[in-house]
Amino acid sequence: HDGYNTDSTDEVLPLGIYPEINVSYEKTNANASPAIYFDSYGHAVVPLLGGIAIRDLNAEETKTLGYFSPKQHDGGGYVIQSSYTFLDSENRIVCPTSNNHVLMLRATDEAGNVLPEFEKVLDIDIKAAAEAALGKELTQNLLSVVFDYDGNLWFATGGFRIYPEREQQGVLGYIAHSAIEAILNGEQADLSKAVFVYGLALGEGAENGIAASKDGAVILTNQNCYLLRAEEGVDVVWCTPYESVGAKVSGEGDKTTGGGLAWGGGCSPSLTPDLVMFTDNADPVKLLALDMKTGEIVASMPVLDDLPEGYQVAVENSAIVYDDSEGTVSTIVCNWFGAGSAGLADPDSDSSIQSYANIYDTNWLTKGNCMIAPGVERVDTVKTDSGYEMKSIWSRNDLSDTSILKLSTATGYIY
């Protein structure tokens, strides 16, 4: 798991010289898997029918080797939320659920063999524990989770679009490492002494994944960016507000029918040892660099601001961030506007439900990337004697993509 959310790797990826393309046909899921994670044995971990599975993606027809189904194995009533699922250092699958629990699943034995039925080794009702700690009802659902460098499990409530005027109550918080270890060892844990929360202002909530470094957990809500630390409670090291014009939707004359996802910045924060990088949701959208120690905005500049007429900008995936350790941080941002469902604006919509029908624009689902706005740009943030400065290195208005781009530093290619 890339806790920095850099979306970059030092691994050698395909060079595109005499490439061989392998195809595996999906005949079980209604859609091809929207996310693929790999464990240390090279197994592909993917969403499957509301659950999670290890599947053979090299077979001519995709085959399931082992899986966990909430319906078959746990009484049903919920689905795995795959967007912010990850694997921990022991190859356990850590996943938030649609009923506000976090699960940890053991998918392989000690030798790396896939278990036909994954073993649930941890199940915590985060919303109930957070409500008990806060002393009031939460009106937002669990969105994302991540471990910090001390093994505490941080969580954030929210959804893919949180409207401030709806005044929902949300929290940021963590489950202490000691409680998680106790549960994994088969012991009882007193969650009243192990779950700590920070109550957000009404209408504030997370819309993204969480990043973690040795400095703490970095969480971006629809209005602020936070650095938080676990100190027998949630220590807010800093809180930095940023700009947003609100949820963006297609208008008269636009070449798209969908919109963006987030009300605020849709770019999960990405980290370097010194900086926090993300985009706001202003008009034009700006890339921001915050000082990791203080939260001060040390550099910013508009991105994707030279698109053809009829296109808007919404950055909804984490950016690629590469720190060369010599004073230059390269960031690559990609436009996503057009893929978001217009139905997210409905007053009774729940943007925490991660399903194709709930999140995505029908025309994008059926017609593909011609229904999203183009735009990919590289911006370098350079350390100078007086601070930092940003400069655009290149911009491509002929590319449209909704997948999370990846960088191989070994090849210098973006995938």
Give the ranges of each region predicted by the language model.
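Beta-strand-rich domains and repeat architectures in extracellular enzymes and scaffolds
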Residues: 1-52, 81-83
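Surface-exposed loop and turn segments in beta-propeller and other repeat-based domains
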Residues: 5-22, 67-76, 119-137, 186-203, ...
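Repeated scaffold domains used in trafficking and secretory/extracellular systems
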Residues: 26-37, 72-87, 129-146, 202-212, ...
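Loop/turn-rich, solvent-exposed surfaces of beta-rich toroidal or solenoidal domains
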Residues: 32, 275-280, 285, 317-415
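Short glycine/acidic-enriched loop and turn motifs that connect beta-strands
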Residues: 51-53, 99-103, 159-164, 224-226, ...
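Asp-box/WD-like beta-propeller blade repeats and closely related beta-sheet repeat scaffolds
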Residues: 64-87, 96-150, 156-162, 167-169, ...
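Beta-propeller blade signature
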Residues: 108, 167-182, 224-227, 287-295, ...
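Long, internal scaffold/assembly segments composed of regular secondary structure
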Residues: 210-324
